[in-house]
Regions:
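Short, surface-exposed glycine/acidic/tryptophan-bearing loops
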Residues: 1-17
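Extracytoplasmic and endomembrane cell-envelope/extracellular-matrix remodeling and assembly machinery
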Residues: 15, 20-23, 27-46, 52, ...
């Protein structure tokens, strides 16, 4: 099954450099998964030279798209008969592109004051196993829930590093709490 913000399958994730173990799933690490997704998109663009084809392959896989191009003797993803999910996916990507290019035209108005302030985090490099992530969280001044919230790639209550170094994000306490004086009512 596909996991994380970028909905990567396990095989694709591993192919593009992500680690998946019993205690770690880097598909849920937004930064690492984004970098892996970008590597996939770059490879697909180098292969197809066409962004619609890249989008089709992101949904269906490069193997499937390459095979269908040959079987159907087609040159474009728009000329392929694909499953409905993939066809709809490509058109949704095209719609999102239009919205991003002209958000006001489609009724999307985001002002700076409407955006959430990012929560600053300290990065802690970990290269040894942690048997108790709850205790690790407490030692770093946060709850286990906050540790999981800011590090969704942690799959278990422990971290087995297997010789790798991982970066754990620790949110800064001063940024963690909602400040009501900064709130105003929208009419």
């Amino acid at each position: 099954r596909a996991v994380g913000t970028w909905q990567l399958l396990e095989g694709t994730a591993r192919q593009y450099g992500l680690t998946i173990t019993s205690t770690v799933d880097e598909r849920c690490d937004v930064t690492k998964a984004t970098e892996a997704a970008c590597r996939y998109l770059k490879a697909a663009y180098e292969k197809y030279g066409d962004w619609a084809m890249v989008a089709s392959s992101y949904n269906a896989g490069m193997g499937r798209i390459s095979g269908e191009l040959v079987k159907q003797d087609a040159d474009s993803s728009f000329d392929l008969w694909l499953v409905e999910e993939t066809t709809r996916y490509v058109y949704r990507i095209m719609a999102i592109k239009q919205i991003f290019e002209a958000p006001y035209k489609y009724g999307f108005v985001l002002r700076a004051q409407d955006l959430y302030k990012p929560i600053a985090c300290e990065s802690v490099a970990v290269s040894t196993d942690i048997q108790d992530l709850s205790g690790f969280a407490k030692k770093n001044g946060i709850t286990y829930a906050d540790l999981k919230r800011f590090n969704p790639w942690l799959r278990d209550r422990k971290l087995l590093t297997a010789g790798k170094t991982y970066t754990i994000r620790i949110p800064k306490e001063s940024d963690m709490y909602y400040k009501t004086p900064n709130t105003y009512v929208h009419n």
